[in-house]
Amino acid sequence: MRTYVINLDRAAERLAHMRRQFDQLGISFVRIAAVDGTSLSDRELLSFRTLAENGERPYQWMPSEIGIFLSHKLAWSTIASGDDQYAAVFEDDVHVSDEIATLLKDSSWIHNSADIVRFETTLQGMKLARKPISQAGQMKVFRVYSGAWGAAGYVIKREVASWLASSPPRTFGPVDWFLFHPESVVAPALSVFQLDPAPCVQDQYHPDVDSRRNLGSHVLTPTGIAQALKTGSRRLLSPMVRKATGRRGIPYA
């Protein structure tokens, strides 16, 4: 199973961060040169926004979000043209646990019904199947029955990558919404699973503050109404809401 890391040309520190981790685990990876949304022309930005237009729920796309979306589509296209049945995709600001090495070296742990298996946690509540479908090392694999945030670490089936690469990005939010939000045009058709505990977490969500490397974000923070729309639905659910909705947080391994 090949491993891919999405990385901007100007983000050398992030690439070094990923290389240190994977070198220690004996994992090789292929770098995907990320699309820099801030370098796209007005025509290119308009073209994407037109393709992504969702009349019912308009979304105020930022150039950096467009770049991230196009970068994942580039990764999907690369996977679709390869020979591996499954491939792993990471953004370049994640921390990975030692347990992930075994998973990346052998795909036999992946259930044949899985389209996508999420490696990461954002510490947000998720609704999972009551019982795991399988075991992956020290981690359990659960079917996901809710929306999920984050697309910084996942395994994807080649046929699904091909389908997503050729699908128009018609969505009302960033790439993780496209993949995992229940109202997405593609998410309801996907069989998504989650590892618990999660062997991957973005730097900004690392539960140990001292372990964060302050890699920052390539997504500029919106202001005003746009900020409310983008962040309001992403707030961490309170314990009471989690219990009422059957959701639970996924710890980082």
Segments and roles (model prediction):
Residues 1-90, 94-253:
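An acidic/histidine-cluster motif and surrounding catalytic segment
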